[in-house]
Amino acid sequence: MTQDELKKAVGWAALKYVRLGTIVGVGTGSTAAHFIDALASVRHQIDGAVSSSEASSAKLQSLGIPLFDLNEVDSLDIYVDGADEINGSMQMIKGGGAALTREKIIAAVARKFICIADSSKLVDVLGTFPLPVEVIPMARAWVARELVRLGGAPVYRQGVVTDNGNIILDVHNLAIMDAVALEEQINNIPGVVTVGLFARRGADVALIGSEQGVKIIG
């Protein structure tokens, strides 16, 4: 199976976690896009969706899935999204698609976080994938210096502006042994909006696609 076929398999496998008559939290990226395709097959049986990015919102609307603003919703039953890396403790690096802040907010609201990923994203130690940090533009140089002090090598993601109007620094050369502590350290740097470490609020269930099928963790 190709990587895209593995992503499609886990996207459709996540459909069994969707309860009819609920509003579903939807993530961003190529794997989440397959879940949106699957969600369209039950669009008349759910109330709608809350999206973590403008791109996912556009896809949801194009498929006729009602879209809600998060401020209109008291709670979400589930949030389904991909990951750039996930470890055995269900901690993740996310933000390759630059939607990390909205993803983290929706994950916090949802009762259950379903991570969908192909097997290449499952790692023992987080950090091979550069860690995205969303930063207020005026603080870019300051935050970069602070990230160097933490042992990282930050690189400005040229030409990318988040849906919130901010920039992304991708931090290389990190072997993340204590993800919870590092998440807190980086989030405490003035000028950081949020870091793409999902450790304090990790996934509850991971659906991992491989040649052998979809493996359920959690």
Curated annotation (Swiss-Prot):
One of its GO terms (cellular component) is cytosol. Substrate binds at residues 28-31, 81-84, 94-97, 121. Pathway: Carbohydrate degradation; pentose phosphate pathway; D-ribose 5-phosphate from D-ribulose 5-phosphate (non-oxidative stage): step 1/1. Belongs to the ribose 5-phosphate isomerase family. The active site is at 103 (proton acceptor). GO terms for biological process: D-ribose metabolic process; pentose-phosphate shunt, non-oxidative branch. Catalyzes the reversible conversion of ribose-5-phosphate to ribulose 5-phosphate. Keywords: Isomerase. This is Ribose-5-phosphate isomerase A. It catalyses: aldehydo-D-ribose 5-phosphate = D-ribulose 5-phosphate. Its EC number is 5.3.1.6. It comes from the Bacteria. Homodimer.
